Regions:
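Fungal secretory targeting signals
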Residues: 1-26
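A structural motif corresponding to the C-terminal end of an alpha-helix
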Residues: 104-115, 199-223, 257-293
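N-terminal, immediately post-signal peptide pro-regions of secreted/luminal proteins
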Residues: 22-49
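Serine-esterase "nucleophile elbow" of acetyl-processing enzymes
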Residues: 51-123, 171-180, 416-419
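Short amphipathic alpha-helices and their capping/turn segments at secondary-structure boundaries
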Residues: 48-69, 133-153, 206-223, 423
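Structural recognition of the beta-strand scaffold that forms the well-ordered cores
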Residues: 69-81, 118-123, 151-156, 161-164, ...
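Oxyanion-hole/transition-state-stabilizing segment in secreted/luminal serine hydrolases
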Residues: 131-195, 229-244, 401-402
């Protein structure tokens, strides 16, 4: 899309850049000598320096410190779907063990307690880049409170733009049974989106809008940390070729070729994000955006690892959720998990197979989509049988939509790994 601006015709992403940089363009040509850290002593021994303003005092007393804060934006990987709640689950499926929430906990401890920091947790399951951008009905950017301190931002986005759920549904789970479409078609559509420029341009605009929202030219220390995704499978093992994660009897097999292609899709998404980050940083003298690639940290913790019979609901070393599978938080208990879940059958009158699809698609929520597709499948073919194993785990209760939506998302140990990789990246750049 191109827009006429005076005598110039600019692509949409270039127009956004012009708006964000505006009169501050001259700052890009100047050396920025402002420090990027808070120098006060930190309580947590493993924490890196925080991206933040120079200290307003050399005193170690908390009462002399300026209040600090940060924001988390993005999709379900940032929201931490399935990783536990302190109460009723909100519509965004935010989990208490999401890596932004874990960072917020560490951040609060390092600054002297929750009242010394501000954490805006805006990440939402199902979000795309368009839903983060300003002007959308569900805009996370518009929800960001600029009156609160924001010293850095965490961002995770891309999977929903590129059709991760469509690939999972067609190639792995077949929630809509025979009507789920072919795996090849879903993979081709994802590839076409990857090869196009729409996602790149949209991510570019999201980052520039965020810089503009926080008035980056007045906060030279402000930094955006963008996280990627992790490959789902060990693609070298042979035993997984005869295994399936499908929800219906005789679901698709996890053949090596499929695992290789799905892993390649994840790597391509990461590369796209990394290139967009590099493009933005090339406009600035100082780094404004970091890309954190934690994929290798998941080695040994994917599906189809050696000597693992999938689906293995008892393996806590797998960093991704199975359908209805338990979390692997270090202090997790069965009673605690059951207390956090609300049960509902996908075949109850609350799930109308004739009316559920539109709202589910609009929400972008994987769990709502999966539930609706299963209800539609059962209505069309009452003889359908569920796959053997523990698809109906935990006393055969249906936990919706998180029961389904969390599948192939990081469990708590995965989020701890992402958090640690973020810290490692901050340390390596000596922020």
């Amino acid at each position: 899309m191109r827009i006429l601006l005076g005598s110039l015709v600019l692509p949409l992403f270039e127009l956004a850049e012009a708006i964000v940089l505006g009169n501050s363009w001259r700052l890009l040509q100047q050396s920025n000598t402002a420090q990027h850290i808070l120098k006060e002593p930190r309580r947590h021994p493993d924490l890196p320096r925080w991206p933040g303003p120079p200290s307003h005092s050399t005193s170690s007393s908390h009462e002399h410190r300026a209040r600090a804060g940060f924001v988390a934006l993005g999709d379900s990987y940032s929201a931490g779907i399935g990783t536990g709640t302190d109460g009723p689950e909100n519509d965004c499926r935010q989990g208490v063990h999401a890596y932004p929430a874990l960072i917020a906990k560490d951040f609060s401890a390092s600054q002297g307690g929750p009242n010394s920091t501000s954490f805006q947790f805006l990440s939402c399951t199902g979000a795309t880049t368009n839903e983060i951008r300003a002007g959308h009905a569900e805009s996370q950017m518009d929800a960001l409170d600029g009156s609160l301190p924001v010293d850095f931002a965490l961002l995770s986005v891309g999977g929903n733009d590129l059709g991760f759920f469509e690939v999972m549904n067609a190639c792995i789970f077949r929630f809509y049974n025979f009507y789920s479409g072919t795996c090849e078609t879903a993979l081709q559509h994802a590839q076409e989106r990857l090869e196009g420029s729409e996602f790149d341009d949209s991510l570019y605009i999201v980052i520039l809008e965020l810089l503009n929202k926080v008035k980056w030219e007045k906060k030279p220390w402000f930094l955006i940390t963008v996280t990627g995704y992790a490959r789902f499978f060990n693609e070298q093992t042979d035993g997984c070729d005869e295994m399936s994660l499908g929800v219906w009897w005789r679901g698709p097999k996890l053949e090596k070729e499929l695992r290789v292609r799905m892993n390649a899709m994840v790597q391509a998404v990461n590369k796209k994000i990394e290139m967009t980050v590099a493009k933005i940083n090339s406009r600035f003298v100082k780094t404004k955006v970091l890309f954190v690639d934690y994929d290798k940290e998941f080695d040994g913790h994917r599906f189809c690892e050696p000597d693992v019979q999938e689906p293995d609901y008892g393996r806590s070393d797998t960093y991704f959720f199975l359908v209805g599978g338990p979390d692997n938080a270090r202090n997790e208990t069965a009673a605690g998990q059951i207390a956090q879940r609300a049960s509902i059958s996908p075949f109850s009158e609350l799930v109308d197979p004739e009316l559920c699809l539109g709202p589910a698609r609009e929400s972008g929520d994987w769990g709502r989509l999966a539930l609706c597709y299963m209800a539609m499948s059962k209505a069309q073919d009452p003889t359908l049988r569920f796959a053997s194993g523990e698809i109906q785990a935990a006393n055969s209760m249906w936990y919706v939509p998180t029961y389904y939506g969390k599948t192939f998302h990081p469990r708590t140990l995965g989020h701890e790994t992402i958090k640690n990789k973020v810290y490692e990246t901050w340390r390596s750049l000596d922020l």
